[in-house]
A protein has these predicted regions:
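Phosphopantetheine-dependent thiolation modules in NRPS/PKS and related acyl-activating systems
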Residues: 135-147
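AMP-binding/adenylate-forming catalytic core of the ANL superfamily
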Residues: 1, 6-7, 22, 27-117, ...
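Acidic surface patches and DE-rich sequence motifs
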Residues: 10, 19-20, 79, 131
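Short secondary-structure edge/capping micro-motifs at helix/strand boundaries
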Residues: 14-15
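Short, solvent-exposed helix-helix connector turns and helix-capping sites enriched
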Residues: 10-11, 137
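A general structural motif at alpha-helix termini
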Residues: 18-19, 145
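AMP-binding/adenylate-forming catalytic domain of the ANL superfamily
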Residues: 111-135
Length: 147
């Protein structure tokens, strides 16, 4: 709403916020049904592959259902043909075989996701950087996607 903020202070001075019909664009996505507002995610948590929208949280939630996965983060990477491709970075639980687990996780995900949602590549990490509140810092993970 117009009461959210007056504007931004930048190196150029004071700038008005970019609004749509007087409302600030937060990047949140949701829907309005039966006088209730549902927030479903954020615009940057969605990628477009071959014209279809993919919610990265769907991939993460599917991976976290696997008994050997401790943490998971799905990211989108630009692709010349598809537009964007989903990638998955996982931390496996201790005492589990990473090479065995990565193959099993691929099978596990193919059974639970639409074919278009299956990650192009699964990357193993020893840990995922987090904020003080425990949220995964996805910006720090993009370097792992570089070939």
């Amino acid at each position: 709403s117009p009461f959210f903020m007056k504007g931004y202070i930048t190196d150029k001075g004071f700038e008005l916020p970019k609004t749509y019909n007087g409302y600030y664009n937060t990047g949140d996505l949701g829907n309005y049904e039966n006088n209730l507002l549902f927030v479903n995610g954020r615009k940057r948590e969605i990628i477009k592959k071959g014209g279809e929208l993919i919610f990265l949280s769907v991939i993460e939630n599917a991976a976290l259902q696997n008994k050997n996965v401790l943490e998971a983060a799905a990211l989108g990477k630009k692709d010349i043909i598809a537009g964007e491709e989903p990638y998955l970075i996982v931390v496996f639980k201790e005492n589990s075989s990473p090479s065995n687990n990565i193959e099993n996780l691929g099978i596990f995900l193919r059974e639970r996701l639409r074919p278009i949602e299956v990650p192009k590549k699964i990357i193993i990490s020893s840990k995922l950087s987090k904020t003080k509140s425990g949220k995964i810092i996805k910006k720090s993970l993009y370097k792992l996607l570089e070939d």
